[in-house]
């Protein structure tokens, strides 16, 4: 029988006793199994997300907002409860919110090296720039006694959220990569009864001590409760003199187009939250200067698997010298030995050692060296045997590294040096990374499978699809690197392959809405997060092949893939974070960025209808939402 259970307000999912739960945008735990439905001790709890259909022009408003019509079923034995899911925001970027320092502050606002607001001079009112692209987010609880809410019925928790870029200024000109990325700490009140999160204050993190931040994309929470950020698309120091984007970045950050140093960007920032709702930041310079999308720290608290969001990218791994300390360690890059070229393909992974370093010593090199001190690069064949041909960002180059500069090359010219050392620099837009610790599996999102993965120019040659796939890694210990030395980790990837349900499907002809990839399968996966409690992999899209980008849930036991959220048309799914237990509640955090970023022909059939709706919802397309999933209601089932 089924019995509806009504609730007068949104509630979060509450954990059963002793069962940790995934970070759902609003805790998925506020509705425990009814007492009479609880089974005997030891019975397994099962979770299944139930899919919703994609929105369509039959109801245009659903295509122009964050739309959720999915459900979650929680079962024990013969008893189950199904929860309707919804979405709630903390704010839209551009909102005025309470500041942790007193007064108010602009959410997603941009600041220069002196922490002064950066004004959009094309705006009639010279308004402060604010981002339409919130991205990586971490939910952090400091524990009882460290931070207290002023409300007796609430606990104090925090979120760290970063803002990747500004799509355009008021005049409509592109601002991509021209502003220093802000990052903020949100102080949140967590209702002890429902798990509801309410924004109490916002604090912009002072990044002047790390030379500002460059294009912060995905993020993860470390096992020691810090926020691990990113700096993707590292500026090429070899060609920096002609890089207008970087000069604009430097002008906006320093007030001088030549002040910024490219070797200060492309590293891993780490944010520590303070009990007063502020944050402090440092950069780790010893983890490779690559297109950091996000990293995943393994349960040993030393091994870090890293995505590399570029063409001719690599699979990188860092093994820290000490637990919970990323300031020193050994950097490796993967070598793919193909075992299948069918579809997304499969390969065995071995590891090339690039070097060992501390962050301080690489920072000192970054402060003093130029590209010419490290490497000479030719873009046409010099017919000189002292140069080595490599693939770099989709093109052939010939490189010669300066004598004695191996360490600088490994950690500041990482892409070129990894290719020189024989690594498989062929992956295309390897983005999100996460771990399934119980099964010793990791997952990597290959947003697009094309170019250097399919053209035969490297040691990887697979078929596709362009719509991408999520690869599963087998993790183990007892491995040796290319020098024959032991890798001191039990969490080393030794193979990669894509589960059938996690491979996109290209369409030969666009469908009636304009999709060029099957809308009922993933397309161009980006954000990944895994819930140990729910045994569910969450997948957010960054797709130029779906009219609306989706958030998916994949049950690793049933192999069922379910669409659980749709972003506004033209937006991508970002800020994904799954947390199994925050004071007895679980959360799935989810943002989106650049709503109404119309592409042709993808949006040709919907733009005229949806553009006015998106503009009305999101401040003329200048704003985007930061938020989380919620429980809307519950139905009980007894067999």
Name each model-derived stretch:
Residues 1-27, 34:
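N-terminal secretory signal peptides
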Residues 22-25, 34, 38-639:
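Conserved small-residue
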């Amino acid at each position: 029988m089924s019995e509806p259970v009504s609730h007068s307000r949104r509630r979060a999912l509450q954990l059963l006793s002793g069962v940790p739960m995934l970070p759902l945008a609003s805790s998925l735990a506020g509705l425990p199994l009814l007492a009479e439905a609880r089974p005997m001790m030891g019975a397994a709890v099962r979770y299944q997300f139930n899919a919703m259909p994609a929105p369509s022009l039959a109801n245009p408003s659903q295509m122009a907002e964050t739309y959720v019509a999915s459900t979650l079923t929680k079962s024990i034995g013969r008893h189950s409860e199904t929860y309707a899911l919804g979405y709630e925001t903390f704010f839209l970027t551009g909102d005025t919110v309470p500041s942790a320092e007193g007064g108010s502050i602009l959410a997603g606002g941009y600041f220069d090296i002196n922490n002064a607001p950066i004004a959009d001079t094309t705006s009639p009112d010279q308004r402060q720039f604010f981002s339409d692209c919130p991205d990586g987010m971490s939910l952090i609880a400091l524990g009882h006694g460290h931070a207290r809410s002023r409300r007796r019925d609430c606990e104090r928790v925090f979120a760290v959220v970063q803002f990747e870029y500004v799509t355009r200024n008021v005049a409509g000109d592109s601002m991509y990569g021209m502003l220093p990325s802000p990052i903020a700490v949100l102080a949140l009140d967590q209702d002890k009864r429902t798990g509801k999160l309410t924004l109490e204050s916002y604090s912009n993190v002072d990044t002047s001590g790390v030379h500002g931040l460059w294009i912060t994309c995905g993020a993860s929470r470390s096992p020691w409760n810090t926020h691990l950020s990113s700096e993707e698309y590292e500026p090429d120091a070899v060609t920096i003199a002609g890089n207008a984007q970087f000069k604009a970045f430097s002008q906006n950050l320093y007030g001088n187009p030549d002040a910024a140093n490219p070797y200060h960007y492309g590293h891993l920032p780490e944010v520590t939250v303070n009990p007063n709702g502020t944050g402090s930041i440092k950069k780790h310079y010893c983890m490779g200067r690559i297109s950091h999308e996000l990293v995943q720290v393994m349960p040993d608290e030393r091994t870090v698997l890293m995505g590399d969001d570029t063409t001719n990218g690599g699979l990188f791994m860092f093994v820290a010298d000490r637990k919970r300390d990323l300031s020193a360690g050994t950097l490796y890059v993967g070598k793919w030995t193909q075992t299948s070229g069918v579809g997304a393909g499969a390969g065995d992974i071995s590891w090339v050692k690039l070097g060992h370093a501390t962050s301080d010593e690489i920072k000192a090199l970054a402060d003093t060296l130029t590209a010419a001190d490290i490497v000479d690069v030719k873009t046409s064949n010099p017919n000189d045997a002292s140069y080595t041909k490599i693939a770099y960002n989709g093109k052939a180059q010939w490189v010669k590294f300066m004598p004695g500069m191996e360490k600088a090359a490994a950690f500041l010219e990482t892409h070129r040096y990894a290719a020189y050392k024989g690594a498989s620099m062929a992956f295309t837009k390897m983005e999100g990374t996460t771990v399934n610790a119980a099964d010793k599996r990791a997952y990597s999102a290959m947003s697009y499978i094309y170019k250097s993965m399919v053209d035969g120019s490297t040691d990887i040659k697979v078929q596709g699809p362009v719509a991408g796939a999520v690869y599963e890694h087998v993790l183990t210990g007892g491995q040796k690197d290319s020098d024959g030395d032991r890798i001191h980790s039990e969490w080393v990837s030794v193979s990669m392959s894509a589960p059938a349900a996690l491979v996109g499907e290209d369409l030969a002809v666009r469908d009636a809405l304009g999709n060029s990839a099957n809308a009922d399968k993933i397309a161009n996966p980006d954000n990944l997060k895994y819930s140990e409690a729910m045994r569910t992999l969450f997948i957010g899209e960054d797709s130029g092949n779906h009219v609306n980008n989706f958030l998916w849930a994949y049950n690793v036991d049933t192999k069922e893939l379910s669409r659980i959220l749709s972003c506004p048309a033209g937006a991508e799914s970002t800020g994904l974070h799954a947390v199994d237990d925050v004071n007895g509640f679980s959360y799935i955090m989810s943002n989106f960025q650049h709503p109404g970023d119309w592409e042709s022909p993808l949006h040709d059939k919907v733009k005229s209808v949806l553009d006015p709706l998106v503009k009305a919802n999101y401040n003329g397309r200048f704003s985007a939402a930061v938020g989380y999933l919620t429980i809307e209601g519950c139905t009980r089932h007894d067999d």
